[in-house]
Every structure is written in structure tokens, then in C-alpha cells.
Swiss-Prot record:
Involved in beta-(1-->2)glucan export. Transmembrane domains (TMD) form a pore in the inner membrane and the ATP-binding domain (NBD) is responsible for energy generation. PROSITE patterns: ABC_TM1F, ABC_TRANSPORTER_1, ABC_TRANSPORTER_2, NDVA. The keyword GTP-binding does not apply. GO terms for molecular function: ABC-type beta-glucan transporter activity; ABC-type oligopeptide transporter activity; ATP binding; ATP hydrolysis activity. This is Beta-(1-->2)glucan export ATP-binding/permease protein NdvA. The lineage of its organism: Bacteria, Pseudomonadati, Pseudomonadota, Alphaproteobacteria, Hyphomicrobiales. CDD domains: ABC_6TM_NdvA_beta-glucan_exporter_like. Residues 345-579 form the ABC transporter domain. It comes from the Bacteria. It catalyses: [(1->2)-beta-D-glucosyl](n)(in) + ATP + H2O = [(1->2)-beta-D-glucosyl](n)(out) + ADP + phosphate + H(+). Belongs to the ABC transporter superfamily. Beta-(1-->2)glucan exporter (TC 3.A.1.108.1) family. The keyword Nucleotide-binding applies.
Length: 604
């Protein structure tokens, strides 16, 4: 994306503030005209005081300098007041719009598919969000406070200078050409270099975030020095790339300062020669020196503007790349909110592929009736998780249809669909907020009594009550202030509060010890009552009582039946069971069931 297109898009993001933007632009136009009244009036006053020797296009017949001085004061007051008003409203516009864009960006990335987040580091997304919105804020603020007025000033100044004295105006044009050529060359030379610098900034942010997110691993394996050295290496590489860019722009500063000094001297030299020939007045020489000073100031502002756009361009490009990422699924224009569903789930000839070559799910068909528990088993990559992801529309199938209560899930709003589906993940996901806040994710308006009931049913109330702050206890980052079992039981309580007709359990007890697993299983039994439940199972012991088990291989269901039926067939499932020593333990487990029930009752 070219810098011109990039900057145009920056201005287009003003959106609802466009009206104020046009008002500020008009105010800047008035300022651009008013600013040149000062050098013109200054020159005319000098001519009047020196005996009305003006010979240029702006000859004056005013005999007294006082009217000119009064006009100068009036223009000065207008410039001061208008500049203050522009600065005030530009500040407010930039701050309001930065917060609006930041919120919009956050909402956008939260809607992007899990595959996008899997392949993109969260630290990088945070860096892009903060640096991108800060860059937008700086450009908006600079544009309306300085840069636009500077550009308009150049548009006004050069024709005015030609009108007053074209001979002296040529010197100003030469100065503009030097600035333009030099800036263009440096931008062309350093544009790709600055892009590499921003890539290093992203790597630095991602590496630091990665290390901080795994600080326990770093400390336990004595990797602090290694991580610091790695970060220092990235920082050194960043500086090595940044220094040449800074050197080029320092060269621009040196050459432009030299050019401005030479231009002022040239105006005096040419002006004196013209004055001796009667082609200009002392006032016009003074006026053009003021023009040159003002032109230099505006050119430096324009160069600063170009430099700021250039330096911000890679950050903005990265920001827009994220903003342009398209969510995998969206609401259809005619999508409906289904309110509460019953939970009749039907897959009909469903196929889906991530890469368009190898099917992740192929011709999948099955029905889950309300209240049934459907277990999905199979090797990693067999298609279990993909099938469930299609159910709650993380993706849409390339062929086939998924219906709930006879309604195509694609005809439902995403919010309405997902409100009817609860998920208990293998790793309990908690916010760094209070226990109450984490529970209310399931039901935002839940009362304390409802939370207590849900926590009790999920075997979580005891440990909540033991903490000093009870439901106000902070769970810590990713729930690290709680044990694995406590986190999982809170996750189950959250699902109970949500009270969805369809429940997804992603091997919710795989990482727990036996005692904790017993408590969590009791909680799971409670949350599964009366719901259509899908269990993604790796440990076959957890699905012994499932209504039906679907065995996946290469994206297809190769076996289907109850636990005992599949064992009796001596097929793929039976082989999996033997690998997990299930067959030998089946009779023993059946005999021990009453004892387990009694033990569970005692634990609860």
C-alpha cells in the first residue's frame, strides 16, 4: 500500500467525526490565508516608513502606518484565537476517535477464527492494537493542528509571492524543489528499511510476551540468562536496522537548514540588486525574507509530516492487515435469533477441509436427540474437534448441512446459536478477575444466590467459601491462583449458570488426579442432566455411559454404538480400549460401580 493510499485510509477512519474534520479543514484554510497577512503588512509598513518607495504589485497609497498596524493586530488576534480553537477541537477529535478505533479493533480481533489466533501471537496483536491506534492518534492530531495548515500555506504562499515579485519568488520555488527532491529520495531510500525495523519491534514484543507467559518454565529450567540474551540479540538487531534510517533523516535536516540559510542570503543579495535597479522596494525585500522564514517553517512542518507518516507507515500497514482479516463466519442478512432451542442436532453429509485438499471431516451424518450424550473418539487429527467446531460455527462446512431443531445453523445469528451451546474446555479458561466475574460470563445478570447454587452443584462452593473474599476472590491470570480441579469446577459452574440446551465437554478431566477427577465427574454428571451433550474423549473410561459413541478416522465415522456394543464388535474401538487396558477392567469396573457411587457421595 502506497503512503498516499495509506494516509487517505487514515483520514477515512474518522468516520462519524468527518463533519468536524471538514470544519477544522476550513478553519485551517482561513489560518493559512491569515498567516501571510503579517509579512505583507510588515513590508508595507516598512515602505510607508521609508517614504512609500514600493514598486511591486502591492503598491500602497497609505500615508500613515497606523491603519496597517491596526490590521496587523486584527489578523494576529484572529490567528491566535482560531489556532487555539483548532488545537482544542483537533485534540478532542483525535482522542475520541482513537478510543473508538481501539474498541472497534478489539471487537474485530475477538471475532476472528481460532485458527487465526492460533497462528498469531497474542503479544503481537496487542502490540499492533496499541501502536496502531497511537499512530492514528498522532497523525490525526498532527494533520489538523499543523500539517494541513502547512500544506495549505504552501498553496497560498507561492502564488502570492509570484504576484508580488516573480523575481524573488523564484528563489522560494528553488527552495521548495530542494526540499521536495531531498525528501523524496530519502523516503524512497529508507521505506523498506523502516519496514524491517517494525518487523523487529514485533519480534521483540512477541518474544518478551512469550517469555513472560511462561515465566514458571523459564525459572524452573534456569533459562533467565538465555531469554535475556535472546531479547538483547533482537534489540541489538533492531538498533542496527534503525540507525541507518535515523542517519538519512539527520542528513535531510542538515541539508535543509543549509538550504534555508542560503535562500535567505540569496533573497537579500538579489533584493539589493533589484532595489538598485528600482525593481523592488525595501519593504518587499523585508516581506520576502519573512516569506522565506515562514516558508522554511512550513516546509519543515511538511517534512516532519512526511517523516511521521513514513515512520508510522509499517505500524499502520500491520494494523490495517489485521483490520482487513475477514472472520471465517458472519451473520447472514436474514439471520434469526432462535431464542432457546430444544437440542435436536443433525449432521447431514457434512464435509469440511482446512486447506481444500485433505478433508478434515467427510460426509459426516448423525443425529443427537435432546438429552442424549454423544461421545466422539479417535486419534488426534481424526476430525472430532473439527466436527464440534462446525456445530458452533467456528467454521462453516463446504458441503452438507447442520441443523438444530430443524433449523440450519447458518440461518441463525451467531450470538443466538452460541447462547444455546455451553463449552467446558480441557483447560479451564478463566479471566484475571473475581470468581463472580468469571461465573457471570455464563450469565451476566446472575444473582449471588444463583451463583451459589451453580457452584454447589459443580462441587465448587466449599473452596469458594474457604477463601477470605469468597466470590470476590481474584482467580489470577488464566486462573493461576486456583488449582486445576478448582478451575475446572468453576468452568462447570459457569456452564450451569448459562444453562444451555447443548453442552460440549472437551475431555474436561484428563489432567486431574483421581480424587479431583471424582469431584469433577460428579459436577459433570450434574451439568449434563437434561442436555444434549457432546464429549470429545481421549480417555475411554470417561464415556462408559454415553448414549452413543462415534469413532472417527480420517474425518469419517467408522463405528457407532454404545460402549458395550463397540467392544463386542472387536473393531477399531475395541483396539483403542485394549490399548488403554479397558477390556480387562470392564467387569471389575461394573462390580465397583456401587462402591464408587458411595465414595462419591461421601466426597460431595
Amino acid at each position: 500500500m502506497s503512503m498516499l493510499r495509506l494516509y487517505t485510509r487514515v483520514l477515512q477512519l474518522l468516520g462519524g467525526e468527518a463533519r468536524l474534520g471538514w470544519i477544522l479543514a476550513f478553519a485551517n484554510l482561513l489560518l493559512a490565508g491569515a498567516q501571510f497577512a503579517e509579512p505583507v503588512l510588515f513590508g508595507r509598513i516598512v515602505d510607508v516608513l521609508s517614504g512609500n518607495l514600493s514598486t511591486g504589485a502591492l503598491q500602497t497609497s497609505v500615508a500613515s502606518p497606523w491603519p496597517l498596524l491596526g490590521a496587523w493586530v486584527a489578523f494576529g488576534l484572529f490567528t491566535i484565537l482560531c489556532s487555539a480553537a483548532v488545537a482544542l477541537h483537533a485534540d478532542r477529535l483525535a482522542h475520541r476517535q482513537r478510543q473508538a478505533i481501539l474498541t472497534s479493533y478489539f471487537e474485530h480481533i475477538m471475532q476472528l477464527p481460532l485458527t487465526y489466533h492460533t497462528g498469531t501471537h497474542s503479544g503481537r496483536l496487542m502490540k499492533v492494537m496499541l501502536q496502531g491506534t497511537d499512530a492514528l492518534w498522532r497523525l490525526w492530531l498532527g494533520f489538523f493542528r499543523e500539517h494541513f495548515a502547512a500544506i495549505l500555506s504552501l498553496v497560498v504562499l507561492l502564488p502570492l509571492a509570484l504576484y508580488i515579485n516573480w523575481r524573488l519568488a523564484i528563489l522560494l520555488f528553488i527552495l521548495c524543489v530542494v526540499f521536495t527532491v531531498l525528501t523524496t529520495l530519502v523516503v524512497h531510500k529508507t521505506y523498506s528499511m523502516q519496514g524491517e525495523v517494525e518487523e523487529q519491534y514485533s519480534d521483540l514484543s512477541a518474544r518478551a510476551s512469550d517469555a513472560l507467559g511462561n515465566v514458571a518454565l523459564v525459572q524452573s529450567f534456569v533459562r533467565i540468562d538465555a531469554e535475556v540474551q535472546g531479547l538483547r540479540f533482537v534489540a541489538d538487531r533492531l538498533l542496527a536496522l534503525q540507525m541507518p534510517v535515523l542517519s538519512w533523516w539527520a542528513l535531510v535536516t542538515v541539508i535543509t537548514r543549509a538550504s534555508t540559510t542560503i535562500t535567505v542570503l540569496a533573497i537579500f543579495t538579489v533584493g539589493i540588486a533589484l532595489h538598485e535597479q528600482g525593481l523592488t522596494s525595501v519593504g518587499e525585500i523585508v516581506m520576502f525574507v519573512s516569506f522565506a522564514t515562514l516558508l522554511i517553517q512550513k516546509l519543515e512542518q511538511v517534512v516532519s509530516f512526511i517523516n511521521s507518516v513514513f515512520m508510522e507507515a509499517p505500524r499502520l500497514q500491520e494494523f490495517f492487515n489485521v483490520l482487513d482479516a475477514v472472520p471465517a463466519v458472519r451473520d447472514r442478512p436474514d439471520a434469526v435469533d432462535p431464542e432457546r432451542l430444544q437440542g435436536l442436532v443433525e449432521f447431514k453429509d457434512v464435509s469440511f477441509s482446512y486447506d481444500g485438499k485433505r478433508p478434515a471431516v467427510a460426509d459426516l451424518s448423525f443425529t443427537a436427540r435432546p438429552g442424549e450424550t454423544i461421545a466422539l473418539v479417535g486419534a488426534t487429527g481424526a476430525g472430532k474437534s473439527t466436527a464440534i467446531a462446525l456445530l458452533h460455527r467456528a467454521f462453516d462446512p463446504q458441503s452438507g448441512v447442520i441443523r438444530i431443531d430443524g433449523l440450519d445453523v447458518r440461518d441463525l445469528t451467531l450470538a443466538g446459536l452460541r447462547r444455546n451451546i455451553g463449552v467446558v474446555f480441557q483447560e479451564a479458561l478463566l479471566f484475571n478477575r473475581s470468581i463472580a466475574d468469571n461465573l457471570r460470563v455464563g450469565k451476566p445478570d446472575a444473582t449471588e444466590e444463583e451463583m451459589r447454587t451453580a457452584a454447589s452443584r459443580a462441587q465448587a462452593l466449599d473452596f469458594i467459601e474457604r477463601s477470605e473474599q469468597k466470590f470476590d476472590t481474584n482467580a489470577g491470570e488464566r486462573g493461576r491462583m486456583l488449582s486445576g480441579g478448582e478451575r475446572q469446577r468453576l468452568s462447570i459452574a459457569r456452564a450451569l449458570l448459562k444453562d444451555p440446551p447443548i453442552l460440549i465437554l472437551d475431555e474436561a478431566t484428563s489432567a486431574l488426579d483421581a480424587v479431583t477427577e471424582a469431584k469433577v465427574n460428579l459436577a459433570l454428571d450434574e451439568v449434563m442432566k437434561g442436555r444434549t451433550t457432546f464429549v470429545i474423549a481421549h480417555r475411554l473410561s470417561t464415556i462408559r455411559h454415553a448414549t452413543r459413541i462415534l469413532v472417527f478416522e480420517a474425518g469419517r465415522v467408522i463405528e457407532s454404538g454404545t460402549f458395550d456394543e463397540l467392544l463386542a464388535r472387536q473393531g477399531h474401538f475395541a483396539a483403542l480400549a485394549r490399548a488403554q487396558f479397558m477390556v480387562q477392567e470392564t467387569s471389575r469396573a461394573n462390580m465397583a460401580a456401587p462402591l464408587e457411587h458411595a465414595a462419591s457421595a461421601k466426597i460431595s
